[in-house]
């Protein structure tokens, strides 16, 4: 993706995320490495990044035992790759805003099917259901762009399955043949999340998340980081697929949110927020998104 040598020079804290990046299978789902402790961030015993509430770092397990709690479901942008300080993540900012803890349920390229499974397990096994859910579905699309492979029920191969999936198929299929299954997949599982929230009276906000590719005017540090410039043929294909189909994905998510009568919050198809790399927000960008999410969530609480 971006020129990480430049990024680490311009943003030294990113080194901590590179050095401590670890992906672990739980069943067929990738999570982050458990019990990571470093200056920039930490994870709990199941690999979820700690959230901060009233100055205390809390694990997912601790948060779901609270009298009142929220969940932020999503991919690595929710986890906060490159964003130093657990207190600066989406979940911590929403906790600060609403006065109760939010858990950081971020997975590597976390897709809506796997996030639905986590949500269902929390509702079924916890003493109380969450008081709020924010769902960021952008991982459905960004994961697809690695391989141009999608199944309408199961989605795209995870990051550790890419080589195997491409070998099975003899290479990447044309993305225009696979975008419809991808859109069917994201529609199915966003609806599933909305339906379970509605059936249990949980306020839900869908995030209209965005990437550097939709930014209208890059900042100086983003230009110096060479964001958006591919450095190998695989990235060239990935970035081209993203640019070609991001409007299709954005429009489908908007249609689904409208049909479900669920708020869709975020900057939309274009943005002017800050990025660490093409897919991860800096501190100001994260806060800007959370302001949008909070404005949509507040009337529901």
Model-derived features: positions:
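N-terminal secretory targeting modules
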Residues: 1-70
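A generic short-segment signal for beta-strand/edge and adjacent turn/coil regions
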Residues: 34-41, 72-74, 100-105, 172-176, ...
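Detector for Asparagine
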Residues: 3-6, 20, 35, 86-88, ...
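Alpha-helical cap/lid subdomain in secreted, periplasmic
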Residues: 120-283, 287-301
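Non-catalytic interaction surface on structured domains
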Residues: 29-39, 83, 95-98, 210-212
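Short N-terminal signal/transit or membrane-insertion segments
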Residues: 1-11, 63, 68-70, 77-81, ...
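Serine-esterase "nucleophile elbow" of acetyl-processing enzymes
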Residues: 46-108, 113-125
């Amino acid at each position: 993706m971006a020129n990480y040598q430049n990024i680490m020079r311009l943003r030294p804290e990113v080194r901590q995320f590179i050095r401590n990046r670890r992906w672990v299978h739980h069943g067929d789902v990738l999570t982050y490495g458990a019990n990571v402790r470093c200056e920039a961030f930490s994870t709990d015993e199941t690999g979820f990044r700690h959230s901060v509430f009233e100055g205390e770092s809390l694990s997912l397990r601790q948060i779901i035992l609270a009298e009142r709690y929220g969940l932020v479901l999503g991919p690595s942008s929710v986890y906060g790759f490159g964003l130093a300080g657990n207190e600066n993540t989406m979940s911590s900012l929403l906790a600060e805003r609403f006065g109760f803890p939010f858990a950081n349920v971020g997975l590597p390229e976390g897709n809506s099917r796997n996030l639905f499974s986590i949500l269902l397990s929390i509702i079924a096994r916890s003493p109380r259901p969450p008081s709020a859910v924010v769902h960021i579905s952008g991982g459905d699309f960004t994961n697809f762009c690695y391989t141009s492979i999608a199944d309408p029920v199961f989605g795209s191969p995870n990051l550790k399955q890419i080589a195997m999936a491409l070998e099975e198929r003899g290479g990447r299929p044309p993305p225009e043949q696979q975008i419809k299954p991808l859109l069917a997949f994201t529609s199915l599982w966003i609806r599933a999340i909305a339906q379970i929230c509605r059936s249990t009276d949980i306020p839900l906000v869908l995030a209209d998340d965005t990437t550097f590719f939709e930014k209208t005017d890059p900042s100086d540090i983003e230009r110096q980081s060479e964001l958006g410039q591919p450095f190998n043929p695989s990235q060239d294909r990935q970035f081209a697929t993203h640019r070609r189909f991001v409007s299709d994905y954005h429009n489908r998510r908007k249609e689904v949110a409208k049909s479900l009568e669920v708020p869709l919050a975020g900057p939309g198809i274009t943005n002017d927020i800050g990025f660490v790399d093409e897919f991860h927000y800096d501190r100001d960008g994260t806060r800007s998104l959370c302001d949008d999410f909070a404005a949509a969530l507040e009337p529901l609480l």
